């Protein structure tokens, strides 16, 4: 065997095979060095490399890691609606992994933001599965294009931090398929992540790590996943059951490989199943071999910082811009002919930025430039007052007084507000959507002293805006912007670039408007997903709920017009949408064209509309472009629990094209043939179901003809009786028609048996 060739599982002993199915320590695979299988490193995280300085000892220190580029977490990056940019972020992350000899980076996380109080919302992409999947795939493809693996997580239904290690998420098959699976499914089918990390929680009574239906039936057999499945850290509670379910790798190791050996010897695990799981680990090592063999590689720190800078720019969402208060005029620095505005900067976040979330994804950045640092570097003058401390302690009157005095003497005030890290992190959920009260009070005091206030928010998940929005002419939602957030904010605030971010999550007026609150965060060890598929805007828009800001919303310094929307069928249940978008302003900027599909009459309750396509277009002043978005069959389908499959009903569908879920420019319609699925009819099928079925309709017609001929009793023809009739299983016809009803039911069953042979 050559040194460059890894063995087949056939070359290993039983004990060696078993050893491959658990880690070597908290951050390494367990290799078999004697057989040429190295124990490569795997480590966090979703928005940049977090390689612990103590990793070699198997310890975990979330605040002590090698310097790496801190890109915007998913809460910000998702607002870019720019998969190409996200792909560049993935490529840069991979290059840093190569330098640090990390074979697999643990991310991205594509769990749905079921409830905005989720403590880990900063690390996830969206309330919408289509957007989450079509953005996060950029990380997977970008990283793996460089020969480094990703770990798509947390599969599945890890949608809260409360009791996350054991809570039983009780979810309907339809909600799983339409909301909680699609981001995973899309990335698996299109990008084949090299690893997937299962979640801690149970799904309908079974822990994810021991869930054969989840890890094998759905993930591998149905979706065609080719990689390995690892546990979240400490999520494997039964080595044998997990391996049988389809878990390749226990992390971190529990040093119980002998349990696998004994289970194979006594027949609880078949040799073939162990071989499959162990061979998957060998295949993973093979995939990463080339990249891990590169020595003395050094990534370009400045180039990666520029990628982080661009990512931060496109993450910023402008929520309000009354009186065109933005962009600000920095004077000769930005415009040689302009007089500078006197600027006050208030808020500790401007000096001490909150640029990432807390927990396992915490990164030590290669650089860190605050907004105040950026102003100094660019020669832009501003008076600063911290106003408050970055904790949950009561307000400091001296800091408040200083801030108000600073505001009085300014032409415009930039107030940097938001959530301190103590308010949201991995490990716990939030209990309110509000900003800390001391910050709202300070804003009111400052607005009373100066009407020209722009609020710049720093937060990992949405916060309510309506209670204090009247005190600000401008609002920028900047999320957590990574290490280059300061320069990015300056670029947007002073007009070097127009904001182009769009919300990936609705901002509700009140947390109690969210439909999941009736089952949040659960009770007695379980949480019921009673809202079903009506998550986020699917609920708010369907039921006409007022919101602070709708899904997909975001303002620009430019203005745009969408015209010429047209749809053309490309198949029985597929279509293509074309639209022209025009920049009608004198500002170069980007706009995101969003396509929503609205079903017509359906057999099940469906959301008013759902995002099924988008594209981001950069347009110079006055420029127009035509965009094309393809809609596949899944764009029109829902998961039918009756058929246990995706189902497209025949009929007319509305295609809405706009710039948010509530800003629809034009609507067109397309008529689809449907997939023709039918379910066998029985005596328990209603008369209405018989009428709607192709075979059943012929039999219903035969019943009517036989009634006219006197061969069968005639059915009632008045509207009220027909209503009762249509809702009745045909075996109940005797209750309506007596003995004649029994004859009709038997006739229908007999005729169906003939037609369906």
UniProtKB/Swiss-Prot annotation:
Give the protein's biological function: Catalyzes the hydrolysis of a non-reducing terminal alpha-L-arabinopyranosidic linkage in ginsenoside Rb2 (alpha-L-arabinopyranosyl-(1->6)-alpha-D-glucopyranosyl) to release alpha-D-glucopyranosyl (Rd). It is not able to hydrolyze alpha-L-arabinofuranosyl-(1->6)-alpha-D-glucopyranosyl (Rc).
The cross-references to PANTHER family, in alphabetical order and at most eight, read: BETA-GLUCOSIDASE
Spell out the activity regulation: Completely inhibited by Cu(2+) and Fe(2+).
* Native species: Bifidobacterium breve (strain ACS-071-V-Sch8b)
Q: What GO terms describe the biological role, i.e. biological process, of this protein? A: carbohydrate metabolic process
| Similarity field | Belongs to the glycosyl hydrolase 3 family.
Query: What name does this protein carry?
Result: Exo-alpha-(1->6)-L-arabinopyranosidase
Top class in the EC scheme: hydrolase
Which Pfam families does this entry report, sorted A to Z? Answer: Fn3-like, Glyco_hydro_3, Glyco_hydro_3_C
Catalytic residues? 232
Which SUPFAM superfamilies does the annotation name?
(Trans)glycosidases (SSF51445), Beta-D-glucan exohydrolase, C-terminal domain (SSF52279)
Molecular function, one GO term: hydrolase activity, hydrolyzing O-glycosyl compounds
**How do changes in temperature affect this protein's function?**
Optimum temperature is 40 degrees Celsius.
The alphabetical list of record keywords is: Carbohydrate metabolism, Hydrolase
Oligomer status and interactors: Homotetramer.
> What pH dependence does Swiss-Prot or TrEMBL list here?
Optimum pH is between 5.5 and 6.
Cite the EC number.
Answer: 3.2.1.-
């Amino acid at each position: 065997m050559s040194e460059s060739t890894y063995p087949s599982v056939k070359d290993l002993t039983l004990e060696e095979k078993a050893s491959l199915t658990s880690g070597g320590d908290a951050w390494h695979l367990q290799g078999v060095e004697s057989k040429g299988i190295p124990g490569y490193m795997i480590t966090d995280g979703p928005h940049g490399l977090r390689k612990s300085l103590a990793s070699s000892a198997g310890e975990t220190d979330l605040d002590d890691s090698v310097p790496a580029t801190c890109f915007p977490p998913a809460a910000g990056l998702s607002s870019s609606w720019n998969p190409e940019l996200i792909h560049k972020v993935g490529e840069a992350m991979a290059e840093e992994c190569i330098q640090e000899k990390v074979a697999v980076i643990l991310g991205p996380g594509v769990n749905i933001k079921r409830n905005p109080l989720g403590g880990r919302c900063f690390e996830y992409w969206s309330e919408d599965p289509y957007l989450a999947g079509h953005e996060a795939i950029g990380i997977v493809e970008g990283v793996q294009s460089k020969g480094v693996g990703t770990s798509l997580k947390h599969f599945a239904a890890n949608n809260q931090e409360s009791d996350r290690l054991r809570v039983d998420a009780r979810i309907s098959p339809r909600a799983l398929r339409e909301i909680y699976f699609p981001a995973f499914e899309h990335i698996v089918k299109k990008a084949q992540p090299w690893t997937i990390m299962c979640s801690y929680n149970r799904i309908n009574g079974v822990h994810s790590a021991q869930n054969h239906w989840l890890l094998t039936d759905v993930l591998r057999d149905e979706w065609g996943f080719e990689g390995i499945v690892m546990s979240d850290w400490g999520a494997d509670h039964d080595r044998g059951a997990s391996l049988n379910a389809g878990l390749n790798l226990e992390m971190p190791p529990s040093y119980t490989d002998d349990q696998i050996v004994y289970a194979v010897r006594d027949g609880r695990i078949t040799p073939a199943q162990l071989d499959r799981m162990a061979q998957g680990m060998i295949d993973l090592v093979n995939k990463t071999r080339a990249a891990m063999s590169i020595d003395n590689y050094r990534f370009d720190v400045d180039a990666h910082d520029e990628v982080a800078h661009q990512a931060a720019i496109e993450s910023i969402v402008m929520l309000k811009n009354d009186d065109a208060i933005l962009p600000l005029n920095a004077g000769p620095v930005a415009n040689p002919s302009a007089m500078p505005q006197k600027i006050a900067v208030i808020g500790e976040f401007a000096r001490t930025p909150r640029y990432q979330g807390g927990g396992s994804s915490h990164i030590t950045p290669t650089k860190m430039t605050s907004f105040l640092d950026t102003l100094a570097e660019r020669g832009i003058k501003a008076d600063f007052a911290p106003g408050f401390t970055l904790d949950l302690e009561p307000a400091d009157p001296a800091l408040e007084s200083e801030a108000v005095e600073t505001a009085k003497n300014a032409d415009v005030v930039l107030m940097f507000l938001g959530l301190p890290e103590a308010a949201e992190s991995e490990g716990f959920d939030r209990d309110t959507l509000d900003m800390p009260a001391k910050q709202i009070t300070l804003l009111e005091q400052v607005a009373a002293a100066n009407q020209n206030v722009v609020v710049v928010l720093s937060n990992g998940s949405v916060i309510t805006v309506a209670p204090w929005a009247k005190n600000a002419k401008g609002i920028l939602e900047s999320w957590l912007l990574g290490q280059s957030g300061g320069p990015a904010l300056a670029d947007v605030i002073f007009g070097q670039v127009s904001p182009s971010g769009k919300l990936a999550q609705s901002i509700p007026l009140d947390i109690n408007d969210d439909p999941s609150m009736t089952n949040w965060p659960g009770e007695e060890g379980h949480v019921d997903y009673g809202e079903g598929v009506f998550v986020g805007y699917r609920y708010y828009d369907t039921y006409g709920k007022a919101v602070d800001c709708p899904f997909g919303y975001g303002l620009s310094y430019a203005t745009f017009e969408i015209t010429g929307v047209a749809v053309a069928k490309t198949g029985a249940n597929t279509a293509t949408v074309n639209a022209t978008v025009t920049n009608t302003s004198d500002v170069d900027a980007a706009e995101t064209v969003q396509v929503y599909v609205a079903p017509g009459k359906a057999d099940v309750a469906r959301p008013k509309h759902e995002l099924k396509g988008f594209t981001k277009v950069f347009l110079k002043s006055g420029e127009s472009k035509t965009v094309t978005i393809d809609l596949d069959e899944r764009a029109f389908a829902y998961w039918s629990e009756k058929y246990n499959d995706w189902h497209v009903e025949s009929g007319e569908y509305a295609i809405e094209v706009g710039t948010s879920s509530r800003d629809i420019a034009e609507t067109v319609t397309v008529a689809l043939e449907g997939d023709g699925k039918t379910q066998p009819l029985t005596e328990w099928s209603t008369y209405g179901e018989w009428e709607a079925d192709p075979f059943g309709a012929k039999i219903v017609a035969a019943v009517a003809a036989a009634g006219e001929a006197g061969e069968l009793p005639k059915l009632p023809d008045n509207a009220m009786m027909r209503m009762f009739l249509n809702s009745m299983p045909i075996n109940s016809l005797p209750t309506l028609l007596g003995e004649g009803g029994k004859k009709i039911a038997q006739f229908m069953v007999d005729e169906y048996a003939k037609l369906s042979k």
